[in-house]
Regions:
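Non-heme Fe(II)-dependent double-stranded beta-helix
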Residues: 1-17, 23-123, 129, 170, ...
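Extracellular structured ligand-interaction cores
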Residues: 19, 105, 136-140, 152, ...
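Non-heme Fe(II)/2-oxoglutarate
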Residues: 36, 44, 48-54, 61, ...
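A short beta-loop-beta micro-motif enriched in histidine and acidic residues
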Residues: 97, 126-138, 191, 198, ...
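Short, structured patches in soluble enzyme cores that scaffold and shape functional sites
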Residues: 107, 125-127, 143-147, 159
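A short secondary-structure junction signal
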Residues: 115, 119-123, 133-134, 151-157, ...
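Short, conserved beta-strand element in jelly-roll/cupin
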Residues: 131-150, 197-198, 205, 229-233
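Double-stranded beta-helix
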Residues: 148-211, 235, 246-249
Length: 254
């Protein structure tokens, strides 16, 4: 029997540590369907006829780079169905203590095997890239579409970092992890890193203020995650102008 922690324990963990791991939400059939649908999108096959919001990897690009595509749910109904699944939404609402949740952005993050340094994502907070939200009430859910072990380059969380002040110099795009560790050490001499080693179909949730990163995938299989950014009824928008304003202009997409 698979142990399922009580909702109250998951709520407390998310609040105090900045992240939590849900039990298996999606069965193997659902994850396999979504996996194949995402691969179609990566290959430029759009079932709905609509392109994604943005592609950060094109066919013919370096296969060792992390493949990241924004809003793949627009391209394929199976992906749409995955991120709008009622049971999934109920879990997110329960754990975040929300009366209502809404997906406002999605990404596929496909980390190739043996990706080397190109598979590294630097330490960062999601909030530092989201000037259009206040920190409270905004979260990220990471759906594992492949088993994630220590060799896969799992997402790594710093326990309790959701309660820290901002640390200047940390950045998702900075692959020089050794230098980032120096910055972390100067700011916080004592901290604990937890790997999100979860099984296919499980989900990790983290706060917009939780520092996280990932190392290269040294395994023989891709590490595939469907990233779902969602807001709750207690999230507050901040008016912004320019390119960033488009992120929240199409909330009806999800």
């Amino acid at each position: 029997m698979i142990y399922k922690p009580p909702i109250k324990d998951l709520k407390q963990k998310l609040k105090s540590e900045g992240f939590c791991f849900l039990p298996n939400i999606f069965n193997s059939n659902r994850t396999n369907i979504a996996y194949n649908a995402l691969w179609d999108v990566i290959q430029g096959k759009y079932e709905t006829g609509k392109p994604p919001d943005a592609r950060f990897w094109e066919i013919g690009d370096d296969p060792n780079n992390i493949i990241k595509i924004d809003k793949p749910h627009l391209c394929n109904k199976k992906i749409w169905d995955l991120i709008t699944d009622n049971n999934f939404g109920q879990w997110l609402a329960n754990v975040t203590d929300a009366k209502r949740i809404q997906v406002w952005h999605s990404q596929v993050v496909w980390k190739p095997p043996c990706s080397g340094k190109k598979g590294i994502a630097g330490w960062h907070r999601d909030n530092q890239y989201w000037p259009f939200w206040t920190p409270e009430g905004v979260f990220t859910a990471w759906i594992a579409l492949s088993d994630v072990n220590p060799e896969s380059g799992p997402v790594r969380y710093i326990q309790g970092s959701n309660q820290w002040n901002n640390i200047a110099g940390l950045d998702f795009f900075d692959k020089n992890i050794s230098e980032q560790y120096k910055i972390l050490q100067d700011a916080q001499s004592d901290y604990k890193v937890i790997n999100a080693t979860i099984r296919k179909g499980q989900v990790s949730i983290h706060s917009s203020l939780t520092y996280h990163s990932s190392m290269q995938n040294t395994s023989q299989s891709p590490r595939v995650g469907m990233v779902v950014h969602f807001c709750t009824d207690y999230a507050k928008r901040i008016p912004v102008n320019g390119e960033l304003s488009r992120y929240l202009n199409c909330l009806e997409d999800t």
